[in-house]
Amino acid sequence: MAKDLMQMLAADIVLGDGGMFLEANWRGYDVPEIIGTNPQALQQIHRDFHNAGSQVLQALTWFTSSAELEARYGWQDRVEEINRTAIEAAKAASGGSAPVGGCLVSTKTGSRA
């Protein structure tokens, strides 16, 4: 079971898995395509960060809004599946021992002030 993030933060410095997007690109994968076509590779990237000392993993949810998935791959009907897969890959990488966070990115719907 994942440790409580607030307890971890209260006790010490907590290391995250910086650079998931860039690491996926460096390994030759397109984001977010890797989520829908090769979740095992995504899980391996998370595992590598965890094995390197990351205590918290961030699900690779960049460009996973309906608008982005439609524009890039015609995957507008796969939004829930893609996001769930991204989260599950991060959770599985640590065997459930690390907390997993997500990110909110631009929805391109005018949400910026």
Task: Locate the predicted segments by residue.
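Domain-level signal for soluble alpha/beta catalytic cores
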Residues: 1-113
